[in-house]
Amino acid sequence: MDAVYLGSTGLQVSEIGFGTWRFGREDATGTVEVGKQRAFELLDAYAEGGGRFIDTADMYGDGLAETWIGEWFETREWDRESFVVASKVYWPTRGDPNGDGLGRKHLRWSVDAILERLGTDYVDLLYTHRWDDETPVEEFMRTLDGLVADGRVHYLGTSTFEPNAWKVSRANEIARQRGYEPFTVAQPRYNLVDREIVGNYLEMTREYGIGVCPWSPLAGGFLTGKYDRESGVPEGSRAARSDDFGDRYFTEANFRVLDVLLEVANELDAAPAAVALAWLREQGTVPIVGARTPGQLETNLDAAGVSLTESQYERLSEAA
């Protein structure tokens, strides 16, 4: 797997990142999606496939994802320095008035807790997991700048700020005026059928040289090709367990996109998921993929070997 520069930074990451949001997470039935043993198997498969960009958050599995990543590094021979590890802060992590948001107290406490769980003294990339309307932008940008100055954080990013490009612009303009570290990475929802960021948001990332790492690059599995018009929502599937999955994705417009995706996948003798990820890679983004099994992860990583012709890329873009 190749390494690519993340936006205008000097940080190189694997062209496909591995997201750990399923680690320790309970679904609607109370079943843990990915337990510790499976988490280690997935991390092994990702690293053995050449991956070196791991994405997590303090609230994934109530901290278990970070803890397991830290334990995985301790029990494996992989060099932590050869990996880029990203985490996120914002959501409640303790039950007191300062236990969430982007206020200085919560930010600094959260980063300390993240580092302890990961068993490291720094995190390569720290995302703010949401925008905080209650905390002054000046306060959280100054605090984030201090974390970079301390060496506990190397780069700053935003997650799920879309489609409000003005929020990132405002924060980065304050950073520019004050000499603070700016946001240099964005993690929006983006794929062939979720395109809210097309327009102002993507233009903003280009203006500031911000790298884009899409989450949900396969639209929660819709773009894997396992769903079709006739079958509807299969029992026991992720769509059946979700309150809004079917409403969001099971539309005629989205199935028309899926039709083109399946055509291109057939032409390339590749999995639809790999083609959907290749479409994102063609735009210079670094998609963050998740998986419940090593087989799913292998299919996703196959995207690194898929190249679209100009015609195929245009057909997919026009369909979307």
Briefly describe each language-model feature range:
Residues 1-84, 149:
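N-terminal binding-site loop/beta-alpha segment at the start of enzyme catalytic domains
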Residues 6, 18, 39, 54, ...:
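Conserved, mostly hydrophobic/aromatic
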Residues 22-28, 181, 206-262, 283:
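Glycine-rich, positively charged active-site loop/lid region within alpha/beta enzyme cores that binds
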Residues 26-27, 94-196, 200, 207:
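Glycine/proline-rich, positively charged
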Residues 43, 66, 70, 111-115, ...:
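Generic structural signal for well-ordered alpha-helices
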Residues 148, 250-306:
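Conserved short secondary-structure transition element at the edge of the structured enzyme core
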